[in-house]
Amino acid sequence: MSISNQLFDRAQAIIPGGVNSPARAFNGVGGDPLFIEKAQGAYIYDVDKKSYIDYVGSWGPMILGHNHPEIKAAVIAAVENGLSFGAPTEIEIIMAEKVKSLVPSMEQVRMVSSGTEATMSAIRLARGYTGRDKILKFEGNYHGHSDSLLVKAGSGALTLGQPSSPGIPADFAKHTLTATYNDLASVQQLFTEYKDQIACIIVEPVAGNMNCILPQEGFLQGLREICDANDALLILDEVMTGFRVALGGAQAYYDIKPDLTTLGKVIGGGMPVGAFGGSKKVMQHIAPTGPVYQAGTLSGNPIAMHAGLAALTALDRPEYAQLAEKTKKLALGLKRVAKEENVPLAINYAGGMFGFFFTEAEQVSNYTQACACDIEKFKKFFHLMLEQGIYLAPSAFEAGFLSLAHSDQDIEDTLTAAKKAFSML
């Protein structure tokens, strides 16, 4: 029995399911999860002293690679002055100014401690600003585990086959409307049916929680037009895509201006940070300047702010362009070696994120199509790659992530392993 196996046995006795977030449990692929001891650059190292090329990147934040020296130095320096004050600090201002400089639609920014807090707060703000109760989201889009948003969701909820969670009252869930991703007609139909009742549309501009599904041409622009025509707000959930699809997020990549944006993952440099922001007109409705209440003891934590600022500063350099080039090389390489081994594979990628689907279909563009892919084949592929030292997301419904630390050799080694794995399916 490996040390990871032993630790998982201990964990299950004291932690529900042995993990503190369901996707980590390997339920989506079978077997016991790896317990990680350390990480450096593009590699993670488990407690059994095995190394892996990592394409999970802590589920997105590690865009610079693990244990980045500038982030580590910033955290160590900040710790010298204390861990948390519960009072304003200058670093919060500097961090917010940096976010605004990269994402101009965020004229004002409120820091929180997680992506779930960011989306939950943005939804409350949209409801308070418009005076409407209903919100519209998309099947397979995941926006955190708050009650309003855990309806027909993606990510770990989809992996576990529970896209809508018990514990959410029907009277509450009825205010969450769901449409089909990449289908504007389904959106328009709901706005017609619930005229003047919908506060906002919230959408992952690239759906990274039902694997990696790209918006079809005109989809995001169509959502903007529908919101404008109905006096509803458009919220782009960029917790995953922010600073990863492009330095200015998916909104820069696809040239779309939202009313509100939510951020997480990359913004914290590995620390627990989230943020939401938008036009000053809307953000002025947040307490203490407005009536919509939102608060958090550790919001704007100075250690997290220093880590996040170091991460964004390091990203804001010419080398950032290499991220998309590395991702394209990996994605097209996977497509090529799969074809060489006669394995049907669909590939999607944008910026520094990618996804692949075992399917005969040329394109996967919504929740139904993602669920129709060969999940059993993915499970086999996952373990064949893991045995060769390649760590992929342990679920067919999660996107993969590259970092600037991944070398050309890392990618070549990954493709060599993938070719062998495809040949064994």
UniProtKB/Swiss-Prot annotation:
Signal peptide: none
Superkingdom, taxonomy of origin: Bacteria
Cellular component GO terms held in the UniProt record: cytoplasm
Reactions accelerated catalytically: (S)-4-amino-5-oxopentanoate = 5-aminolevulinate
GO MF terms, alphabetically ordered: glutamate-1-semialdehyde 2,1-aminomutase activity; pyridoxal phosphate binding; transaminase activity
UniProt cross-references to CDD domains, sorted A to Z: OAT_like
Alphabetical UniProt keywords: Cytoplasm, Isomerase, Porphyrin biosynthesis, Pyridoxal phosphate
Pathway(s) this gene product operates in, as recorded in its UniProt entry: Porphyrin-containing compound metabolism; protoporphyrin-IX biosynthesis; 5-aminolevulinate from L-glutamyl-tRNA(Glu): step 2/2
Any one GO biological process: protoporphyrinogen IX biosynthetic process
The keyword Isomerase appears for this protein: yes
Modified positions (N6-(pyridoxal phosphate)lysine) in chain numbering: K265
Subcellular localization, as worded in the UniProt entry: Cytoplasm
Cofactor(s) essential for the protein: pyridoxal 5'-phosphate
Pfam families: Aminotran_3 (PF00202)
InterPro entries reported in the protein's UniProt record: 4pyrrol_synth_GluAld_NH2Trfase (IPR004639), Aminotrans_3 (IPR005814), Aminotrans_3_PPA_site (IPR049704), PyrdxlP-dep_Trfase (IPR015424), PyrdxlP-dep_Trfase_major (IPR015421), PyrdxlP-dep_Trfase_small (IPR015422)
EC number annotated for this UniProt entry: 5.4.3.8
NCBIfam families assigned to the protein according to its UniProt record, in alphabetical order: hemL, PRK00062.1
Complexes and interactors: Homodimer.
UniProt record similarity statement: Belongs to the class-III pyridoxal-phosphate-dependent aminotransferase family. HemL subfamily.
Name of the molecule in the record: Glutamate-1-semialdehyde 2,1-aminomutase
Organism (species): Psychromonas ingrahamii (strain DSM 17664 / CCUG 51855 / 37)
Gene: hemL
